[in-house]
A protein has these predicted regions:
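C-terminal beta-strand-loop-alpha-helix "lid" module of Rossmann-like NAD(P)-dependent dehydrogenases
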Residues: 1-250
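Conserved small/polar residues in nucleotide/adenosyl-binding loops
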Residues: 249-254, 258-260
Length: 260
């Protein structure tokens, strides 16, 4: 039977661990609030970009652009797809990394001409271990999502899309459905789908617009910014999901320690 000194030592060890866990829990809570605020602050701007595209397409629905070209002439099995995969830089985040990596791996193996663009150290390590080539890895991004970092990712995938080296681009990230549920999610970034932009409210004012210098020139500017907005939103939402998962993991750890 343990003597009194051993019991006291054990109790102090548990208390010290709980203090550390509680401190980490508070840090995760703070980061979660900051991430949510960042997203809320930028949503109006990117919403206005989507509305601008919607207005153009309502007035010129027959517009032809590579940004809306679904390339139906290419068999689905032969399409070259790019997958931007958002993971964490470190573990101890519950199922957060497992779910998004599992989805990305399954999607990547569905074709022979796919490219991976990885955000987060754990994703890079996983795909390297599996022997899957990563086209581009983006460092120092997941712990500090910003518009600049989102634009860097956009520039790379837009470059390959404009060159014709990619037919479709997707982003795989973690969406926080509510305070309790998070799911791995896939969004198609390119090409854009016209039907996603042409659902106008019934009371929308059908004003006349004049497009100068051309619709394509306008889309050259607006579409990359729109894609950047989606990527940025995905980065922030993934970051918020990661912090939420860490918060839950540390809270459970603290409760487990306290019950011993």
């Amino acid at each position: 039977m343990a003597n009194t000194k051993e019991i006291q030592k054990r109790m102090k060890s548990i208390q010290d661990t709980m203090k550390i866990t509680n401190a980490m829990y508070m840090i995760s809570s703070s980061k979660l609030r900051v991430a949510k605020q960042k997203l809320e602050d930028t949503e109006p701007y990117f919403y206005s970009l989507q509305m601008a595209i919607s207005r153009f397409l309502r007035h010129i629905p027959d517009t032809e652009s590579r940004y809306f070209d679904q390339k139906t002439e290419i068999p689905d099995a032969e399409k070259r797809r790019g997958y931007i995969v958002i993971t964490a830089d470190k573990g101890l985040a519950g199922a957060y990394n497992h779910n998004v990596i599992k989805m990305a791996h399954e999607l990547f193996e569905q074709g022979n001409n796919n490219k991976l663009f990885v955000v987060g150290e754990l994703g890079r390590q996983y795909f390297a271990k599996e022997g899957l080539e990563v086209d581009t890895e983006f460092k120092y991004t997941v712990q500090n999502p910003s518009l600049h970092r989102a634009r860097v990712i956009t520039d790379r995938v837009m470059e390959l899309y404009d060159k014709g080296e990619l037919d479709e681009v997707y982003i795989v990230y973690t969406k926080m459905e509510n305070a309790f549920n998070m799911n791995a999610e896939k969004i198609q970034l390119l090409p854009l789908k016209k039907e996603d932009f042409m659902r106008a409210p019934i009371d929308t004012y059908q004003e006349e617009i004049k497009v100068e210098p051309s619709m394509e020139a306008i889309l050259e500017h607006v579409v990359p910014n729109c894609v950047t907005g989606i990527i940025y939103g995905s980065l922030v939402e993934s970051f918020a999901s990661e912090q939420k998962d860490r918060k839950s993991t540390r809270l459970n750890s603290s409760h487990t320690r306290g019950s011993r």
